[in-house]
């Protein structure tokens, strides 16, 4: 073949693959000419490994291959029931030394396997998705969990199990608390940039969130039974363990209504007329549930309902706001809350309501508000944490640099309660999202609620009549009917 023919082939290949292995033209991304002072930073942002990363480095591929892929990915997670988590196979609510030790062994091994499979799920994503700043934070955090639990010494004694429970609390109260907002911000950014189909992104977040609930449930159950046993308690509450409580539907509805009214007063003014809040149906209903999740679900839904009702009241110039009516219904299998308003119906498309990505315009609006939330700046919390050698010094540095200016104010960062409180709070990030100011419209409330409702064998649906109003129907499964059902990322 002549040199001319070879050059022709090369030229045709260049025309077909002009964007492969070529130096990027950064000028097309700039408003004006390239500033030479910025040139050194291009290498920093384009290099293969993040700065100060404890896990993503030149050795990561080989370590990941030999440890995660060739070892832990060959093991399957164990589906468990609520009964097993509380009883550990001896079919009683009695707390014993053996039960606590077996619980610790199971949690240590199971969490490593489960987080390994989620790491692999992230690794299978397109590079420009998993390389997103927020997904990198989640990946770093997951690998931190994987390595920390994998390397933790074998649990053989009650003292080992007790120390393991303390270790778990430190993990949950540390920098892993920001995984939830980082997951959502990463999804929003990928939607805006067209990096991943919206349907696939919604499924990815749903999978990761359900797995997150399961992991925290397993961990919290072990912390609970260990604390109970070491404090002298001899028996768990019922078969579900003490992290589940008997919840009064009316009490939680009234609390959610009160918080929503405070939200409206903050949004407008203190003495603004409030809609009448009416509870109908099975008003005396009490059922066993995870208190924080019930508070979040009812709070998020009522917050939206109150906001829509008040906007309708002002827009129409009504004499007083229309009432909000909650109908409570129950049977042997499930509990149902129907929240009805007369606020004119929902304006957005149905597909946008249940999506984390939404349209590009709404995704950008949500992302902007996420970035305004105190404690969620785009500076990585992991960079600060990893720059210190001891856990306590990490927390003190974080508090003084990031948290102190907002302490005891309405702008207190979302991460603060989880990081420094002396006792563990289950799903603190959820409640902090719920407490956000009206200024921060995130647009992911219903999508989040649907994932959590489905996890608990329920559902969330919305029925809107344009020009009249909306019914939001929250269904939750009866946990006492599903205590022995084996599931992986669902009850």
Swiss-Prot record:
<dbReference type="Pfam" id="PF10436">
    <property type="entry name" value="BCDHK_Adom3"/>
</dbReference>
<dbReference type="GO" id="GO:0010510">
    <property type="term" value="P:regulation of acetyl-CoA biosynthetic process from pyruvate"/>
</dbReference>
<comment type="similarity">
    <text>Belongs to the PDK/BCKDK protein kinase family.</text>
</comment>
<dbReference type="InterPro" id="IPR018955">
    <property type="entry name" value="BCDHK/PDK_N"/>
</dbReference>
<feature type="binding site">
    <location>
        <begin position="383"/>
        <end position="446"/>
    </location>
    <ligand>
        <name>ATP</name>
    </ligand>
</feature>
<feature type="binding site">
    <location>
        <begin position="359"/>
        <end position="360"/>
    </location>
    <ligand>
        <name>ATP</name>
    </ligand>
</feature>
<dbReference type="GO" id="GO:0005524">
    <property type="term" value="F:ATP binding"/>
</dbReference>
<keyword id="KW-0808">Transferase</keyword>
<dbReference type="GO" id="GO:0004740">
    <property type="term" value="F:pyruvate dehydrogenase (acetyl-transferring) kinase activity"/>
</dbReference>
<dbReference type="GO" id="GO:0010906">
    <property type="term" value="P:regulation of glucose metabolic process"/>
</dbReference>
<dbReference type="InterPro" id="IPR036890">
    <property type="entry name" value="HATPase_C_sf"/>
</dbReference>
<feature type="binding site">
    <location>
        <position position="341"/>
    </location>
    <ligand>
        <name>ATP</name>
    </ligand>
</feature>
<keyword id="KW-0067">ATP-binding</keyword>
<comment type="function">
    <text>Inhibits the mitochondrial pyruvate dehydrogenase complex by phosphorylation of the E1 alpha subunit (PDA1), thus contributing to the regulation of glucose metabolism.</text>
</comment>
<dbReference type="GO" id="GO:1901524">
    <property type="term" value="P:regulation of mitophagy"/>
</dbReference>
<keyword id="KW-0418">Kinase</keyword>
<protein>
    <recommendedName>
        <fullName>[Pyruvate dehydrogenase (acetyl-transferring)] kinase 2, mitochondrial</fullName>
        <ecNumber>2.7.11.2</ecNumber>
    </recommendedName>
</protein>
<dbReference type="InterPro" id="IPR036784">
    <property type="entry name" value="AK/P_DHK_N_sf"/>
</dbReference>
<dbReference type="GO" id="GO:0005739">
    <property type="term" value="C:mitochondrion"/>
</dbReference>
<feature type="binding site">
    <location>
        <begin position="300"/>
        <end position="307"/>
    </location>
    <ligand>
        <name>ATP</name>
    </ligand>
</feature>
<keyword id="KW-0496">Mitochondrion</keyword>
<feature type="domain" description="Histidine kinase">
    <location>
        <begin position="153"/>
        <end position="480"/>
    </location>
</feature>
<keyword id="KW-0547">Nucleotide-binding</keyword>
<dbReference type="GO" id="GO:0004672">
    <property type="term" value="F:protein kinase activity"/>
</dbReference>
<dbReference type="InterPro" id="IPR039028">
    <property type="entry name" value="BCKD/PDK"/>
</dbReference>
<keyword id="KW-0809">Transit peptide</keyword>
<dbReference type="GO" id="GO:0005759">
    <property type="term" value="C:mitochondrial matrix"/>
</dbReference>
<comment type="subunit">
    <text>Interacts with PKP1.</text>
</comment>
């Amino acid at each position: 073949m002549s040199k001319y023919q070879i050059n022709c082939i090369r030229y045709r290949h260049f025309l077909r693959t002009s964007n492969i292995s070529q130096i990027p033209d950064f000028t097309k991304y700039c408003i004006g000419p390239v500033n030479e002072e910025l040139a050194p930073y291009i290498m920093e942002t384009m290099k293969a490994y993040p700065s100060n990363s404890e896990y993503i480095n030149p050795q990561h591929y080989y370590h990941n291959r030999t440890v995660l892929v060739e070892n832990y990915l060959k093991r399957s997670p164990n589906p468990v029931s609520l009964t097993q988590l509380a009883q550990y196979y001896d079919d009683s609510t009695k707390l014993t030394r053996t039960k606590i030790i077996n619980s610790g062994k199971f949690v240590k091994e199971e969490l490593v396997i489960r987080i390994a499979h989620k790491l692999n799920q992230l690794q299978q994503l397109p590079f420009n998705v998993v390389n997103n700043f927020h997904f990198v934070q989640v990946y770093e955090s997951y690998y931190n969990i994987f390595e920390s639990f994998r390397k933790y010494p074998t649990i053989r004694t009650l003292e080992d199990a007790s120390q393991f429970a303390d270790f778990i609390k430190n993990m949950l109260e540390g920098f892993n608390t920001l995984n939830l907002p980082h997951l959502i911000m990463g999804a929003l950014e990928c939607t805006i940039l067209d990096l991943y189909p919206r349907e696939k992104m919604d499924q990815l977040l749903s999978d990761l969130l359900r797995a997150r609930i399961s992991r925290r449930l397993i961990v919290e159950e072990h912390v609970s039974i260990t604390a109970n046993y070491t404090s002298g308690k001899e028996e768990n509450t019922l078969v579900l363990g003490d992290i589940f409580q008997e919840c009064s539907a009316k009490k939680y509805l009234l609390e959610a209504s009160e918080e929503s009214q405070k939200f409206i007063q903050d949004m407008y003014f203190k003495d603004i007329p409030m809609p009448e809040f009416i509870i109908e149906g099975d008003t005396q209903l009490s059922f066993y549930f995870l208190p924080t999740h019930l508070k979040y679900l009812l709070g998020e839904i009522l917050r939206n309902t109150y906001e829509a009702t008040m906007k309708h009241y002002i827009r129409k110039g009504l004499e007083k706001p229309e009432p909000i009516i909650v109908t409570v219904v129950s049977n042997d299998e499930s509990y149902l809350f129907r929240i009805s308003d007369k606020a004119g119906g929902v304006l957005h498309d149905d597909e946008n309501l249940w999506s984390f990505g939404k349209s590009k315009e709404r995704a950008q609006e949500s992302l902007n508000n996420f970035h305004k939330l105190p404690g969620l700046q785009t500076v990585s919390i992991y960079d600060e944490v990893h720059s210190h050698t001891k856990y306590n010094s990490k927390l003190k540095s974080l508090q003084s640099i990031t948290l102190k200016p907002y302490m005891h104010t309405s702008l207190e960062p979302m991460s603060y309660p989880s990081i420094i409180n002396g006792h563990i709070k289950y799903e603190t990030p959820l409640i902090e999202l719920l407490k956000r100011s009206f200024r921060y419209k995130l647009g992911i409330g219903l999508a989040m609620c649907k994932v959590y409702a489905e996890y608990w064998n329920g559902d969330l649906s919305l029925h809107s009549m344009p020009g009249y109003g909306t019914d939001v129907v929250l269904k939750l499964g009866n946990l006492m009917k599903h205590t022995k059902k084996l599931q992986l990322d669902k009850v």
